[in-house]
């Protein structure tokens, strides 16, 4: 009986060391073959449109084009490969954004290597694959509905910053009100924008005001 053809994998991550580690893990499985690597979203899109790839392992937080933007572009281009997010982020906002955008799986980089490899194998066969923490988020969303509080992923301090931001205060003014440094304010704003999956202070403010008005 002829051996089954290995499924073709592309690894997309802006950290060379991580790409090497994932490649070494996949090389333990004769049923898989890494045929491409990309260090950024644009390169991944180019390779995905030129090569016959079965599985794309896509990092979320990359320099330049984010994993979400890359995923959206791949789907717009009609790429049919199984796209599995492989990331350190277990924020529910990231999970829902990527899955709603069409990801076929969401795996965490701190997963046990054997568990990770088994999940990738299952994904190559067409299954939806998620780490346990991600499955928990999905079960909770199904149980309580998609209209959950979008701010539940924020820390108390991030909520404080967002509240002041929505009042139109500058970073310097927020720092004064909350008695923290202006640099700390910038860090909190960057983190809350990422968690809320919005790109600007204005978008975060609009979301905050809309949600507050709905309550």
Swiss-Prot record:
DNA-binding region(s), chain positions: 171-190
Transcription is among the record's keywords: yes
Entry keyword set: Activator, ATP-binding, DNA-binding, Nitrate assimilation, Nucleotide-binding, Phosphoprotein, Repressor, Transcription, Transcription regulation, Two-component regulatory system
Residue numbers bearing the 4-aspartylphosphate modification: 59
Top-level taxon of origin: Bacteria
Cited Pfam families: GerE (PF00196), Response_reg (PF00072)
Residues covered by the Response regulatory domain: 8-124
Recorded GO MF terms: ATP binding; DNA binding
UniProt xrefs under SMART domains: HTH_LUXR (SM00421), REC (SM00448)
Any one Gene Ontology BP term: regulation of DNA-templated transcription
Start and end residues of each HTH luxR-type domain: 147-212
Role noted for this protein: This protein activates the expression of the nitrate reductase (narGHJI) and formate dehydrogenase-N (fdnGHI) operons and represses the transcription of the fumarate reductase (frdABCD) operon in response to a nitrate/nitrite induction signal transmitted by either the NarX or NarQ proteins.
NCBIfam families named among the record's database cross-references: PRK10403.1
PANTHER family, sorted: NITRATE_NITRITE RESPONSE REGULATOR PROTEIN NARP, TWO-COMPONENT RESPONSE REGULATOR
Name of the protein in question: Nitrate/nitrite response regulator protein NarP
The organism of origin for this protein: Escherichia coli (strain K12)
């Amino acid at each position: 009986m002829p051996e089954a053809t290995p499924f073709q994998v592309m690894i997309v991550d802006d950290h060379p060391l991580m790409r090497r580690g994932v490649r070494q893990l996949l090389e333990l499985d004769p049923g898989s073959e890494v045929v491409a690597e990309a260090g950024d979203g644009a390169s991944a899109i180019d390779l995905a449109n030129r090569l016959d790839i079965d599985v794309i392992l896509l990092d979320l937080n990359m320099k330049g084009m984010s994993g979400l933007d890359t995923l959206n572009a791949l789907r717009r281009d009609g790429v049919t490969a199984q796209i599995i997010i492989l990331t350190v982020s277990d924020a529910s906002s990231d999970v829902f954004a990527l899955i709603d955008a069409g990801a076929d799986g969401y795996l965490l980089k701190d997963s046990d290597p054997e568990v990770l490899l088994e999940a990738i194998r299952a994904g190559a066969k067409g299954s939806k694959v998620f780490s346990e923490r991600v499955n928990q988020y999905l079960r909770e969303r199904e149980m309580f509905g998609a209209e959950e509080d979008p701010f539940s992923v924020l820390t108390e301090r991030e909520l404080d910053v967002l509240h002041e931001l929505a009042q139109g205060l500058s970073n310097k003014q927020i720092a004064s009100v909350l008695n923290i440094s202006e640099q700390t304010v910038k860090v909190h704003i960057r983190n809350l924008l990422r968690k809320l999956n919005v790109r600007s202070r204005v978008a975060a403010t609009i979301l905050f005001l809309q949600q507050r008005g709905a309550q």
